[in-house]
Amino acid sequence: MTTDSVKLVFSGVISTQLWFAALLANVGVMTLLAFTDGELFPNLSGGATAILSISIILGAIASIVTHWKLTRAMALAHADEQGDVGAWIVWGVVAMLPAAIISILLYIGSDKQPFWLLSSFISGAASCLLVPLLVHAAGCAINRNSPSRNSIIDYWWSRYKRLFVAYFIASVPLTMFSDALDHYGKSTPTVAVFSAFVSSILYFIITLLTIAVTVIAYREAEVGKPVSAI
């Protein structure tokens, strides 16, 4: 039988993907901006503004939908702590922070490679770390006996650290390759789209696996014994 916390985790998947789309939009626009040498936007300031605007719009939609879905899920589960729903709006805002930081780095960093690499690192870290924190907050809102934040993150890290490291091993060289192409004037729209596509696929896989591992952690806590791992 599917437990309440597992139902709640899955009810938040769609909402999580919505605000997660803000990060994907950042990756796509940032990559195109890097490869078009000012053709997409007149200057980096305009590009940074566009990236931040896209993120704010998607983040706002995500916050509204997340609030609605979580409220509905808690009502169906007869939860008592509906005041915790407001915490999810905070997470919707948190989801927009990487975009703001990336925009600032683009504006002040110009064509400096370390700033592009740091931007990629921030996006990757946000995509990997915010998802388990989100589903943990949802679990605590409905299940007062759910694992503590430390235990759920420790469990997640023990199962997920190799994938986390593999992601950065793949994403950082990809960013460096993109910067190199841009620096030597050999970038093409095809390469830009391919780079954005690969990054999006990596983010998508990271999200699905993180949610799956978190669900397993909750089920193990509820049944009191290990269940089948991924």
What is each PLM-predicted segment?
Residues 1-29, 82-101, 131-176:
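Interfacial aromatic "cap" segments that immediately flank transmembrane helices
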Residues 29-67, 118, 122:
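Alpha-helical transmembrane segments in multi-pass membrane proteins
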Residues 4-10, 112-121:
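Short secondary-structure boundary segments
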Residues 13, 17, 43, 47, ...:
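Juxtamembrane/transmembrane-helix boundary motifs in multi-pass membrane proteins
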Residues 47-48, 54, 58-80, 133-143, ...:
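Juxtamembrane transition segments at transmembrane-helix termini in multipass membrane proteins
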Residues 120-136:
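Small beta-barrel nucleic-acid-binding modules, principally OB-folds
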Residues 52, 56, 81-108, 116-124:
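Alpha-helical membrane-spanning segments of integral membrane proteins, especially the hydrophobic core
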Residues 34-43, 103-114, 177-191:
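Juxtamembrane "helix-exit" motif on the non-cytosolic side of transmembrane helices
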